[in-house]
Structure formats: C-alpha cells, structure tokens
Design a protein with these regions (language model features):
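S-adenosylmethionine
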Residues: 55, 64-70, 74-180
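Active-site phosphate/pyrophosphate- and oxyanion-stabilizing loops and adjacent acidic/basic residues
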Residues: 31, 58, 132
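Class I SAM-dependent methyltransferase "Motif I" SAM/SAH-binding loop
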Residues: 50-54
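Alpha-helix C-terminal capping segments
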Residues: 36, 59-65
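Short acidic/polar alpha-helix capping motifs at helix-coil junctions
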Residues: 48-49, 73
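Class I SAM-dependent transferase core
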Residues: 1-47, 77-94
Length: 180
C-alpha cells in the first residue's frame, strides 16, 4: 500500500470521516476486499458504496489499477474529499460520484446505467438493505464483498436464496456470488 494513500486516509480521519482505529489497521482490513476478490479481468467495473472516508475504495484503487472504480457517497463534503484524494493519488481509473445508491440501483434496473461486475461496501447501512442494493447494482455472475463483524452469522440463507446469491466468508469480509 502506498504511503500517499495512508496519508490520505489520515486526512480523512482528521476530517471525521473515519473512526479512531489506527489507519494502518483499517487499510489492512480494506486490502482484504481485494484479496477476497482474487484476480479480476482488465476493465472490470467496481463500485464502492458509501465511500466517504475512503475505505475500502482508496485502498482498492491502489490494489486494482486495471479496474474501473466508482466511489459513491451522497454527502458532498465526503465526495469533495475523495475527489481531492483521487486526484492527488493519480488514480485516473477512479470516478467519484455524489449520488444516492438507491437511485443508482433504479437506474441500473431501468437500463439507464450499466450494472457492475463488483460491488463493495463497508459500514454502509443495515446488512439486508446493503445487500439488497448491492445486488440490484450487480449483473448476473458478478460479485459483492461486504465487511463482516468478527463473529456470528448475520445472513439469513432464505434471504440470500431470494436474491440469487451464494456466499462465503473470506477473512474479515463476506463474498457473495450472484448466480448467472
């Protein structure tokens, strides 16, 4: 991970966009998203939901330079920060959008927006809401990665079946595979 990315995350923390956890630990946790995904094809489209503080989005931008990454948050202060950070880090493969994820999901379903190959989320919202929105943004055969609490099973298998998902825990994240 680049030192410049760690510094951008420290700035995010100073602005109150990240919690008190040491930035290096938070960045390592974010790197687990890329590890869980494994190799992605060049040009794969990834969207990070609620990217405001830069995790995991800025870390993924470092680790997945051949992907087209969209960082989305509905708060302008956070998207302004992300745009500055992306510019400073030279991530030409990253787009920052100030948008409501539910509106984006409707646009994908209406064919106005193209579905994504990968959706990531960390501390976005209630688990079922997060997963339902992520599924609406992901095409058949795509992948969703969501951060997990250290213990416990919070995903009802009937709900996952309803959404057409298979899941597995990979370290600190849960990976959902959208059935083709």
């Amino acid at each position: 991970m680049r030192a410049e990315t760690i510094e951008a995350l420290r700035e995010s923390q100073r602005l109150g966009f990240l919690g008190a956890r040491p930035v290096e630990q938070a960045a390592e946790h974010a790197a687990a998203f890329a590890t869980a995904l494994g190799p992605l094809p060049d040009g794969a489209r990834l969207i990070d939901l609620g990217s405001g503080g830069g995790l995991p989005g800025l870390v993924l931008a470092d680790l997945l330079p051949r992907c087209s990454i969209t960082l989305v948050d509905r708060r302008q202060k956070r998207t302004d920060f992300l745009q500055r950070a992306v510019r400073r880090l030279g991530h030409e493969h990253v787009e920052v959008r100030e948008a409501d994820v539910a509106v984006m999901a409707r646009d994908v379903e209406a064919g106005v927006e193209t579905a994504f190959d990968v959706v990531t989320a960390r501390s976005f919202g209630p688990p079922e809401t997060t997963l339902r929105l992520a599924r609406r943004l992901t095409h058949a055969g795509g992948t969703i990665v969501i951060s997990e609490p250290p213990t416990g099973q919070r995903w009802d298998q009937g709900f996952l079946q309803e959404l057409g998902l298979n899941d597995e825990r990979v370290g600190p994240v849960r990976v959902f595979h959208v059935k083709p």
